[in-house]
């Protein structure tokens, strides 16, 4: 007779890590060239002046400057980087 109960192993207990999407630099914050401003899926926010878009729709700064968010019309948001020299 067994003195211990046989214990089965569970097949649960795993989960994938979150994608860490969202705004990484806020309005008025200083960014350097190449800094990620927004990580997103699809173009929720569109690139404006001095902002590039990556293959996974990540928006990044092309020059050093300050982040500026704007609305274009009713349903389009853009993000710009205003160079520090122009301020």
From Swiss-Prot:
PROSITE patterns reported for this sequence: RIBOSOMAL_L27
Keywords for the protein's UniProt record, in alphabetical order: Ribonucleoprotein, Ribosomal protein
MF-aspect GO terms: structural constituent of ribosome
UniProt keyword Ribosomal protein, yes or no: yes
Family annotation (InterPro entries): Ribosomal_bL27, Ribosomal_bL27_CS
Spans annotated as Disordered: 1-21
SUPFAM superfamilies assigned: Ribosomal L27 protein-like
GO biological process, one term: translation
Cellular-component GO terms for this entry: cytosolic large ribosomal subunit
A Pfam short name: Ribosomal_L27
Keyword presence, Ribosomal protein: yes
Entry-linked PANTHER family: LARGE RIBOSOMAL SUBUNIT PROTEIN BL27M, RIBOSOMAL PROTEIN L27
NCBIfam families in the record: L27 (TIGR00062)
Family: Belongs to the bacterial ribosomal protein bL27 family.
Name of the protein in question: Large ribosomal subunit protein bL27
Gene that this polypeptide is encoded by: rpmA
